[in-house]
């Protein structure tokens, strides 16, 4: 999935990162710019991009909030909440499947 291309060629890598998402992350963490957008097909680099993006926009780091922001942009957890409902449910299910039992 690291070389995945989605959204009619507009999203790259396992995290399906769009160029505008990458630009927001780079603006928050300028050192990311050294590799360029196409490097989001490298999982380690893509994870740094996602963390920079979420660090910029997430007020809290709940699964619900970060999933909605990753999927719907900065307003994904607030104004565009309804548009990100499906993605948030999928993220919660995936998290619950991997979460260790106490």
Regions found by a protein language model. Give the residues of each.
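Catalytic glycan-binding domains that act on GlcNAc-containing polysaccharides
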Residues: 1-102
């Amino acid at each position: 999935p690291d070389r995945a291309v989605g959204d009619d060629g507009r999203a790259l890598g396992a995290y399906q990162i769009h160029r505008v998402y990458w630009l927001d992350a780079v603006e928050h963490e300028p050192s990311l710019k050294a590799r360029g957008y196409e490097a989001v097909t490298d999982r380690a680099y893509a994870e740094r991009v996602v963390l920079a993006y979420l660090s910029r926009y997430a007020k809290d780091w709940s699964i619900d909030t970060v999933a909605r922001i990753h999927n719907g942009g900065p307003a994904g957890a607030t104004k565009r909440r309804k548009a990100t409902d499906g993605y948030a449910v999928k993220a919660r299910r995936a998290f619950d499947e991997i979460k260790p039992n106490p």
